[in-house]
Design a protein with these regions (language model features):
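Acidic-histidine catalytic/liganding microenvironments
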Residues: 82, 165, 666
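Active-site-adjacent helical/loop segments in soluble small-molecule enzymes
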Residues: 162
């Protein structure tokens, strides 16, 4: 039966005049496909649902076909039947409270059989480990990057890969540095979990990209908004979770090789993976993975950008063992990159800097006529090592005990241009981190509730000068040496029925940070200052299944974040950002109160999801450009002239909407629309905030062919001009809005996957408001990439 979708009274989306007709025209086309007739839909699909552990039949399991109205519930014998299905390729989903959901792809021609074996749901709402698919059991707004969409973006940085998910954008420093922005928040307010461990680097910097090789993980999920109390209350923006596939448990050796070429920058990427078990040693598994990347100067629509190459050399090793009662795994990775910083962002005097900002095109000295692969100064040279051990033990009372310990070393060198033959223009950051977690996971607190409790600890030492944290030698570093300790305690309880789920969690953190700065350069007298912060975070999430087609969820949460060392103590030139940054040691901790609501509705061939959120942050800390009476303020140093940015504290309100709607025109043709809108307001000073993402709209279409998993897809990305900026609050006006056309295609031939992607196909010249180098140059022009992957 086809269900009609009616416009709800009172709903109105206000658009600027120059884009109203474009949106209306698209929506008319989009919704007109709803009347397509169905024919020849005679197929039947049946199967059984049981538990994986003891093979018991599971009644009441929800089984549905994604993108259709075909859904049912397993009967008392665990059997399900779906009838009147059109022939074609579908994604079949089975879910049940307290079990991990399962997705599988089926090719249906007449009558099909598909059985499911469900595993106990060991992870909880707010700390779901990524499985590369839609996580049904979460009360947080979330997005996933998986399957074909993930494959299309292989070879890109993590920040660039996530850009395009609803509610997620990218903060850039030129074309080579990118980091995720979730609902307008980024850096220290976004936790990145790599292999289940908090990634600890110099993530406070807008130009400090995550030190992660995305090839190390096949599954990526973004939880939007405060959540994941297990991992820290400071995730006011959200969490990016990366997890690999489980280690193999058979002795057979498998692997893959991926070769990718990007035309823009003439960048080559080579990544390989090899995994297997140990012969005659049941339970053991291992994996080795590595990536190489090499690229030169990036090209805009009209010119090359000097010194914008990138190089990467990454490797990771994993070893694990599992039995019926316990399991353990070891993991080690090394990430190394050298990133060129656009030379036009480091200028020697005020007049040249102001001229560079005002020109529509960079000075000729910074736009070479030919492609250059060599990376010169200024640049970033970054090394990141991560070693982790994790153990799991199943207790007799059906509870479990988990322990994780990790060591990380992050070494960052930022080299400025040489001036007057002196080699003093260098920043060094060396961050060593030891962290751990002990978790007691109660499978059943009683017949109705289940929960978990545990504590986390973190110990860090940050060195910018001298051999040790306690023995600094220089007073001229951007940051002083400092040590940091953080201890957190958390508890989460969850109850689930067939119709609804409820989760309540609380966390308490105490953080101590102590600085070490010499009285003068190379002075034996060390001045120490100590700051202690503590705060409570908590959340309540409720999810309700209205029927087989509709579910809604609401979350109310409070998050606490202590100031970071950069926000408290910065005072100097930040080479990578091309800015002079000044901190404030009197800053207080942030507290955020967030309310989010989302609904997922799947009538007929539709899949519609809308999320609303409102995040009020007291004592919000942000980096603001110094402007007095409309005139920019600059710092003149021996390193050159740089715009001044200061850390300030206000009360802020972030509100927005994420919308994603797709329609299955036929089993082979799908269209989709995505919308991301965020509004940020300084309620203390009654004005808009700077550096907030502009409205973003995406229109996509995909057609899949019958053979070899071949497909073609295309889309238009529209980013509006950011008009909600106070006059005179920045060094230049926000750039104009823009449209980008992107094309994709792929095919599988035996063990080979071949795909082509064209980004910015029309070679548009544009500048993005979230690119800190928009003052100086255009963004990247057309980029054609080709990937060949071999799996064995």
């Amino acid at each position: 039966m086809t269900k009609n979708i009616r416009e709800k009274d009172g709903f109105r989306l206000s658009l600027s005049p120059n884009c109203q007709m474009k949106h209306v025209f698209f929506l008319l086309i989009f919704f007109s496909f709803n009347g397509f007739a169905q024919s020849n839909c005679h197929c039947t699909l049946k199967g059984f649902v049981s538990t994986k552990e003891n093979k018991e039949k599971v009644p009441g399991a929800y089984v549905y076909i994604k993108g259709t109205n075909k859904a049912t519930v397993s009967d008392s014998k665990g059997q399900f039947i779906l009838k009147d299905i059109c022939p074609g390729k579908y994604t079949l989903v089975c879910q049940m409270a307290s079990f991990d959901p399962i997705e599988t792809v089926i090719n249906l021609e007449d009558e099909g059989q598909e059985d499911f074996q469900l595993s106990s749901h060991e992870e909880h709402l707010q700390e779901v480990f990524v499985q590369g698919r839609k996580q049904e059991n979460t009360s947080q707004l979330n997005s996933q990057l998986n399957g074909e969409e993930r494959s299309q973006k292989d070879g890109l940085s993590l920040g660039e890969m996530l850009k395009g998910l609803t509610g997620v954008q990218s903060l850039q420093t030129g074309s080579t540095v990118s980091k995720p922005v979730i609902h307008g928040l980024h850096s220290s307010r976004v936790i990145i979990l790599n292999q289940g461990v908090r990634q600890e680097g110099q993530n406070w910097g807008s130009e400090h990209a995550p030190e992660i090789d995305p090839f190390v993980s096949k599954n990526i999920q973004v939880i939007k908004g405060p959540g994941g109390l297990r991992y820290g209350g400071d995730a006011i923006g959200g969490i990016v979770m990366l997890e690999p596939n489980a280690l193999p448990d058979s002795s057979a050796i498998h692997g893959s090789i991926q070769s990718i070429y990007f035309s823009n920058g003439r960048q080559g990427v080579l990544s390989g993976l090899l995994e297997g078990g140990i012969p005659r040693q049941n339970g053991w598994g291992w994996r080795i993975q590595g990536t190489l990347k090499d690229g030169g100067n990036v090209q805009t629509a009209n010119y090359y950008l000097s010194n914008t190459g990138v190089k990467e050399e990454n490797v990771s090793i994993a070893l694990g063992y599992k039995s019926n009662r316990w399991a353990a795994d070891l993991f080690y990775s090394r990430f190394h990159t050298v990133i060129g910083i656009y030379e036009g962002s480091h200028i020697g005097n005020i007049s040249d800097l102001e001229r560079s900002i005002s020109l529509p095109r960079p000075l000729p000295a910074f736009t070479p006529l030919e492609f250059i692969r060599k990376i010169d100064r200024p640049n970033q040279d970054v090394w990141h090592d991560l070693a982790k051990i994790k153990a799991y033990y199943k207790l007799p009372n059906r509870a479990s005990l988990r322990a994780t310990a990790a060591i990380q070393s992050d070494e960052r060198w930022e080299l400025d241009v040489l001036r007057a033959g002196k080699n003093i223009n260098t920043l060094r950051f060396n961050l060593d981190t030891q962290s751990g977690e002990i978790l007691y996971d109660e499978i059943n607190t009683n017949k109705r509730w289940k929960g978990q409790a545990g504590f986390t600890f973190l110990d860090q030492g940050n060195i910018t000068s001298g051999p040790k944290v306690q023995n600094p030698t220089l007073t001229t570093s951007l940051l002083p040496n400092y040590s940091l300790q953080n201890i957190g305690f958390f508890a989460i309880e969850r109850r689930a029925t067939e119709r609804w789920e409820l989760e309540v969690g609380v966390r308490y953190d105490i953080k101590e940070i102590e600085t070490h700065r010499p009285k003068a350069n190379f002075s034996p007298t060390i001045i120490r200052n100590r700051h202690i912060y503590s705060g409570t975070s908590g959340s309540v999430g409720f999810k309700y299944h209205w029927n087989l087609l509709t579910e809604s969820q609401v979350t109310v949460s409070r998050a606490f974040r202590a100031p970071g060392g950069n926000e408290l103590f910065s005072n100097g030139v930040h080479h990578g950002a091309g800015a002079y940054e000044i901190g404030d040691p009197n800053l207080k901790g942030e507290t955020g109160t967030n309310i989010s609501f989302s609904t997922n509705y799947k009538p007929d061939r539709w899949d519609i999801e809308i999320g609303l959120y409102s995040n009020h942050i007291h004592n919000f800390i942000y980096l603001r450009p110094e402007v007095i009476n409309g005139d920019a303020v600059y710092a003149t140093t021996v390193r050159g002239v740089f715009p001044i940015f200061t850390y300030q504290q206000i009360d802020a309100r972030f509100q927005g909407v994420d919308l994603q709607a797709s329609y299955l025109i036929s089993p082979r043709l799908t269209i989709q629309q995505k919308t991301s809108i965020v509004r940020a307001y300084d309620t203390m000073n009654d004005q808009f905030m700077v550096n907030i993402p502009a409205d973003r709209f995406e229109y996509l279409a995909r057609y899949g062919f019958k053979k070899n998993n071949a497909y073609v897809s295309g889309g238009i990305t529209q980013v509006s001009k950011q008009t909600r900026v106070e006059k005179g609050s920045d060094y230049s006006e926000p750039p104009a809005g823009y449209y980008l056309v992107n094309l994709n295609g792929g095919i599988t031939i035996k063990h080979f996957d071949i795909s082509i992607r064209v980004s910015n196909a029309l070679n548009a010249a544009y500048r993005d408001y979230l690119n800190r180098f928009r003052y100086y140059a255009d963004d990247q022009g057309r980029n054609i990439s080709m990937k060949v992957a071999y799996t064995f």
